[in-house]
Amino acid sequence: MPSISININLAFAAAMLGMLMFRSHMMSSLLCLEGMMLSMFILSTLTILNMQFTMSFTMPILLLVFAACEAAIGLALLVMVSNNYGLDYIQNLNLLQC
C-alpha cells in the first residue's frame, strides 16, 4: 500500500475519531463528516486511477454529489436548530424532550 493511501486512511480514521469525540456539537460533527467524505473521495479517485477502471470514473463524481447534498442538508439543519434553540447541541434534536 503506497504511503499516500496510508495517509488518506489515517485522515479518514482521524475524522471518524473526531466524529466520536465531538459528537455533542453539530458543527464539529458536520466538519468531521466532511473530512470523512473528502478522504473517501480522494481514496476512490486514486483507486480508480491506479486500477484503470474506465467504466467507474463516475463513482467519485457521484460521491461528491452525495457529499454536497449532505452538506446542504446538514447546514440547513444547523441553521434551523440554532435559530430555534440558540445552540448547536445535537441533543436539541431529540423530539421526546419536554
UniProtKB/Swiss-Prot annotation:
<dbReference type="InterPro" id="IPR001133">
    <property type="entry name" value="NADH_UbQ_OxRdtase_chain4L/K"/>
</dbReference>
<keyword id="KW-0496">Mitochondrion</keyword>
<keyword id="KW-0679">Respiratory chain</keyword>
<keyword id="KW-0520">NAD</keyword>
<protein>
    <recommendedName>
        <fullName>NADH-ubiquinone oxidoreductase chain 4L</fullName>
        <ecNumber>7.1.1.2</ecNumber>
    </recommendedName>
</protein>
<dbReference type="Pfam" id="PF00420">
    <property type="entry name" value="Oxidored_q2"/>
</dbReference>
<dbReference type="GO" id="GO:0005743">
    <property type="term" value="C:mitochondrial inner membrane"/>
</dbReference>
<feature type="transmembrane region" description="Helical">
    <location>
        <begin position="2"/>
        <end position="22"/>
    </location>
</feature>
<keyword id="KW-1133">Transmembrane helix</keyword>
<comment type="function">
    <text>Core subunit of the mitochondrial membrane respiratory chain NADH dehydrogenase (Complex I) which catalyzes electron transfer from NADH through the respiratory chain, using ubiquinone as an electron acceptor. Part of the enzyme membrane arm which is embedded in the lipid bilayer and involved in proton translocation.</text>
</comment>
<comment type="similarity">
    <text>Belongs to the complex I subunit 4L family.</text>
</comment>
<dbReference type="GO" id="GO:0045271">
    <property type="term" value="C:respiratory chain complex I"/>
</dbReference>
<feature type="transmembrane region" description="Helical">
    <location>
        <begin position="61"/>
        <end position="81"/>
    </location>
</feature>
<keyword id="KW-0472">Membrane</keyword>
<keyword id="KW-0813">Transport</keyword>
<feature type="transmembrane region" description="Helical">
    <location>
        <begin position="29"/>
        <end position="49"/>
    </location>
</feature>
<keyword id="KW-0999">Mitochondrion inner membrane</keyword>
<dbReference type="GO" id="GO:0042773">
    <property type="term" value="P:ATP synthesis coupled electron transport"/>
</dbReference>
<keyword id="KW-0812">Transmembrane</keyword>
<dbReference type="GO" id="GO:0008137">
    <property type="term" value="F:NADH dehydrogenase (ubiquinone) activity"/>
</dbReference>
<keyword id="KW-1278">Translocase</keyword>
<comment type="subunit">
    <text>Core subunit of respiratory chain NADH dehydrogenase (Complex I) which is composed of 45 different subunits.</text>
</comment>
<dbReference type="InterPro" id="IPR039428">
    <property type="entry name" value="NUOK/Mnh_C1-like"/>
</dbReference>
<keyword id="KW-0249">Electron transport</keyword>
<keyword id="KW-0830">Ubiquinone</keyword>
